[in-house]
Regions:
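Short alpha-helical catalytic segment bearing the HExxH-like zincin motif
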Residues: 84-92
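Histidine-centered, transition-metal-coordinating active-site segments
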Residues: 1-83, 97, 101-279, 287, ...
Length: 420
């Protein structure tokens, strides 16, 4: 599925220019992007650890900093409101390495919001950020919760800046399903509409473009429903838990190290314990160059400031917690499997625990049912509060079928990978 589309080169600067043309770029944004508390996110991938396993063939590395910047540009483009834009920029400030993998390891695969808990504390505790906010006449309370701004964030299946930005680069990187031309067409068709609750929401001017976007979005969301994705995130989450228990990594490390640094530490820890030669290791290292994010002096000042709590209540059919005498062997086995796996098995039952790592999980469904301007209405500007809008599924049989197919889809009960 991930090789359906031919490889293509993507220019992320061109993508950002679609989101917000340079002549409309928010003049205050760059100074915030330079903050250590945000620069840390350059070392955190958007795609939840899939950059580090050959099971995926990600076309390029896209960081949480890139995503945060993209969300801010979208919010600014549609609102020109400084507080909302900065709130969008800061919304992922508490994201640990490997992004939503930390939700999986904390038992939150279904909602994937556990990592948001420290956001307000981090924002209020950063002196440099506080100084910039004061210069711009803003307070922490105005930017610490982007959920209060419906253009920035709302609930599925509505469309928001966060959801919009997340799925554009996900589709480009995971399977190449978005072209720049399609992104430009969809994005330039958007406007602000009023939803059923009378709240602002991004929506489409034309039915045809709304259908195109819905189809692409649900196709990418389908990738995230597959057992391949569930297993990858859960396996990496178990590796993180074992590394923390072994004293190799700490909760603070997950908030301060880059993904590359975590991988290098795991490489060093497990390299003498490999039961098989990592034939793909060289290829993975070359791929990892795309993921590298050097820790600058400004990022260094951010280290050791924040920690997180954990709990492990995710339903996982995998090996029982290893005894101390074998924990290193199990960690090495899991890690080498993660770094070399190229396929998994889809099964109705869990396979033997001593040979396989298996998952049986329900995860967050990412789909969209956007607003679209009613066919008897007209809209010519980005402010369409008086224009009648409807949900796409109410007027499009095609979209209704796509959405229902997505919601009813279920992979096999178990996804399993043979352990090395």
């Amino acid at each position: 599925m991930l090789s359906r589309y031919a490889p293509a080169d993507y220019d992320i600067s061109e993508y950002f220019n679609i989101l917000c043309p340079r002549d409309d770029w928010p003049p205050f944004l760059d100074k915030y992007l330079k903050l250590p508390v945000l620069q840390r996110l350059a070392g955190v991938g958007l795609l939840c650890g899939t950059d580090w396993t050959p099971l995926y063939k990600n076309r390029f590395y896209y960081s949480r900093l890139d995503h945060s910047k993209g969300v801010a540009l979208i919010v600014w483009h549609f609102t020109h409101d400084k507080a909302q834009t900065i709130a969008g920029l800061l919304h992922d400030i508490s994201t640990p390495v490997f992004s939503h993998v930390s939700d999986f390891r904390k038992g939150d695969a279904l909602t994937q919001t556990a990592t948001e808990e420290p956001t307000a504390r981090i924002i209020r505790g950063d002196a440099e950020l506080g100084r910039l906010l004061a210069e711009d006449g803003l307070t922490a309370s105005q930017v610490e919760d982007y959920h209060i701004y419906p253009i920035a964030d709302n609930e599925i299946p509505q469309l928001s800046a966060d959801r919009l930005e997340y799925m554009f680069p996900s589709g480009m990187a995971l399977d190449g399903s978005w072209t720049m031309e399609e992104i430009c067409r969809c994005y330039n068709d958007l406007t602000i509409l009023k939803n059923e609750e009378g709240r602002d929401e991004l929506g489409f001017r034309s039915l045809e473009v709304a259908e195109l976007y819905c189809e692409h979005f649900c196709m990418i969301g389908h990738i995230l429903q597959l057992n391949e994705n569930k297993l990858t995130l859960q396996l990496l989450g178990q590796i993180m838990n074992m590394a923390e228990k072994a004293g190799l990594l700490s909760e603070s490390d997950f908030m301060t190290l880059s993904e590359r640094e975590v991988i290098e530490r795991l490489d060093d820890y497990t390299k003498h314990d490999s039961h098989t030669k990592l034939d793909r290791h060289g290829e993975l290292d070359r791929h990892a160059e795309l993921v590298s994010a050097s820790i600058t002096s400004s990022e260094q000042r951010f280290r050791n400031k924040f920690g997180m709590t954990t709990s492990n209540d995710v339903e996982c059919h995998c090996e029982a917690e290893p005894k101390q005498s074998t924990s290193r062997d199990i960690l090495s086995r899991y890690y080498h499997t993660f770094r070399t796996m190229t396929k998994i098995e889809h099964t109705n039952e869990a396979l033997p625990e001593n040979e396989y790592f298996c998952v049986n999980l329900k995860v967050k469904q990412r789909y969209i049912n956007p607003l679209v301007v009613a066919q008897n209405s007209a809209v010519v500007s980005t402010d369409s509060t008086n224009v009648k809008s409807v949900r796409l599924s109410d007027i499009s049989e095609k979209a209704r079928s796509i959405i229902e197919d997505f919601k009813s889809y279920s992979d096999t009960p178990y996804g399993c990978v043979k352990l090395l």
